[in-house]
From Swiss-Prot:
It is found in: Secreted; Host cell membrane. Its main location: secreted. Disruption phenotype: Reduced cell death is observed upon infection with a mutant deficient in Monalysin production. This mutant is affected in its abilities to induce cell damage in the Drosophila gut. It induces lower level of stress and repair pathway activity than wild-type. Monalysin structure belongs to the Aerolysin-like PFTs fold family but is devoid of obvious receptor-binding domain. Residues 102-170 are annotated as: Pore-forming domain. SUPFAM superfamilies: Aerolisin/ETX pore-forming domain. This is Monalysin. It comes from Pseudomonas entomophila (strain L48).
Length: 271
């Protein structure tokens, strides 16, 4: 049964981070604090063309970028039931796949493993039963984003598959795959599921407590670059800390991104 939200803009209340998240975040702070400013300097891109053009530069790949897009509203299953949830894309980044060496001056076929669906790092960071229906993909359609997979594959559990590419040696090459990050506001889910995610925020709105968190899925897009052009990849902890914890305030629905609450009353943005 879906929990129906109480209409109205979020009001000013204190932001709560569950105790488990506080402890985990504090131990990682030293490792990620130097990236906080960098995240604020990443550009914002909208749609596949702009995102790909920025991230997938063979001569100079980029770590990540903010993503603009629409907000949609529908059910997401967390813990023991469905929750009415606002969802929008907020970030994209390159995930490290593999380093491969070609020792001779020959053209060879490289074989490597990519993934589809939610990322492994997201799945292992969730401490509750979690599932999303394929119809949530209207968020990508409306944001001019295509994953390269079917809707069901895109929002399912992680699956590996083999991809191949011809490359000429000699040389060492680094492979990255594109990850899309989404922000969610699961309305009324904060009391029951505050410990469901490694990083989350809760916000009181009237009698309900909303839960804010991030999820991540992969695109069927990769870039292979010489090791001399390699970029230090972001990890899921760093992304969550900097995108959600450092750059979004649920009390004012502001920061580096915001939700469009009007999706609740728009049949074209509900699933």
């Amino acid at each position: 049964m879906t929990i129906k939200e109480e209409l109205g803009q979020p009001q000013s209340h204190s932001i709560e981070l569950d105790e488990v998240s506080k402890e985990a975040a504090s131990t990682r702070a030293a490792l990620t604090s130097n990236l906080s400013g960098r995240f604020d300097q990443y550009p914002t891109k909208k749609g596949d063309f702009a995102i790909d053009g920025y991230l997938l530069d063979y001569s100079s790949p980029k770590q990540g970028c903010w993503v603009d897009g629409i907000t949609v509203y529908g059910d997401i299953y967390i813990g023991k039931q469905n929750w009415g949830t606002y969802t929008r894309p907020v970030f994209a980044y390159l995930q490290y796949v593999e380093t491969i060496s070609i020792p001779q001056n020959v053209t060879t076929t490289l074989s490597y493993q990519l993934t589809k669906g939610h990322t492994r790092s997201f799945e292992t960071s969730v401490n509750a039963k979690y599932s999303v229906g394929a119809n949530i993909d209207i968020v990508n359609v409306g944001s001019e984003i295509s994953t390269g997979f079917t809707r069901s594959e895109s929002w399912s559990t992680t699956q590996s598959f083999t991809d191949t590419t011809e490359m000429k040696g000699p040389g060492t090459f680094v492979i990255y795959q594109v990850v899309l990050v989404y922000a969610h506001n699961a309305t009324s889910a904060g009391r029951q599921n505050a410990n469901a995610f490694a990083y989350s925020k809760t916000q009181a709105v009237g009698s309900r407590v909303d839960l804010y968190y991030l999820s991540a899925i992969t695109q069927r897009k990769r870039v292979i670059v010489p090791s001399s052009n390699a970029v230090t990849p972001l990890d899921w902890d760093t992304v969550q800390r900097n995108v959600l914890m450092e750059n979004y305030n649920p009390g004012s629905n502001s920061g580096h991104f915001s939700f469009d609450w009007s999706a609740y009353n728009d049949p074209h943005r509900r699933y």
